[in-house]
Amino acid sequence: MKVGIVVFPGSNCDRDIFHVLTDVFDLEAEYFWHEKHLPSKIDAIILPGGFSYGDRLRAGVIAAHSPIISDVKSMAKKGVPVLGICNGFQILVESGLLPGVLLKNTTMNFMCKWINLIVQNNNTPFTNKLKQGQKIS
């Protein structure tokens, strides 16, 4: 399995992702700069976290218009799994690959607290070991 790691100006933890994929899961991984195109022989795509373009306008909005995103969209439509971590998730929302919008919190202050997640869909390569409705904390 070959995983493409998409890198933007301001991305971080892309090396951590590479390490986990190659050294822990023994998968093949390759970095792809946001101005390039993805080869057709990619089995999964990961958009790492960070602060793409310094989050100058909105988190992920500039990166969502990078040339590589059209490849990510077309590959996702063909069933290639795509994972967005932190800013990568924001890029997926801003690009329209995920539904919804990103909103500022009501206090307009930084918030750091633990939250619980509820598994809504366990029919994905990333959630298939979890149970529908399972609480992740």
Where are these regions (language model features)?
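N-terminal beta1-alpha1 cap of cysteine-dependent amidohydrolase-like domains
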Residues: 1-84, 92-114, 118, 131-134
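A structural signal for conserved, well-ordered secondary-structure elements
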Residues: 87
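Catalytic core of tubulin tyrosine ligase-like
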Residues: 124-137
